[in-house]
């Protein structure tokens, strides 16, 4: 099983201002300093979110993922490694010859 994050969370989705307020960080006299501080805070938030998501299996910020399986765990169902799942865009299977076939949504919903 390979789970790939296709896109990082939007920078606007990170609560940098809330973290800055919680930490009671003062604003500096130079805007460049504030921008560098905001970038550092965003990096700390991303690291914290990644740690929490890895330990809990819960996604905190919505973004697309791609799941690739070598085989189904159970023919009737396949548990997903992360939750909550907002939507499943497609289910495709690849045969031994490398041909990809899309499975109709009615067959997997």
Could you say what each language-model-derived stretch is?
Residues 1-109:
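Divalent metal-cofactor coordination and adjacent catalytic microenvironments
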């Amino acid at each position: 099983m390979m789970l790939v994050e296709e896109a990082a969370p939007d920078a606007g989705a990170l609560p940098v201002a809330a973290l800055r307020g919680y930490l009671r960080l003062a604003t500096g006299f130079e805007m460049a300093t504030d921008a560098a501080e905001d970038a550092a805070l965003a990096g700390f938030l991303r690291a914290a979110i990644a740690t929490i998501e890895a330990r809990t299996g819960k996604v905190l910020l919505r973004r697309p993922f791609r799941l690739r399986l070598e085989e189904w765990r159970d023919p009737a169902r396949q548990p997903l490694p992360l939750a909550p799942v907002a939507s499943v865009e497609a289910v495709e299977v690849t045969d031994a010859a490398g041909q990809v076939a899309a499975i109709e949504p009615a067959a997997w919903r």
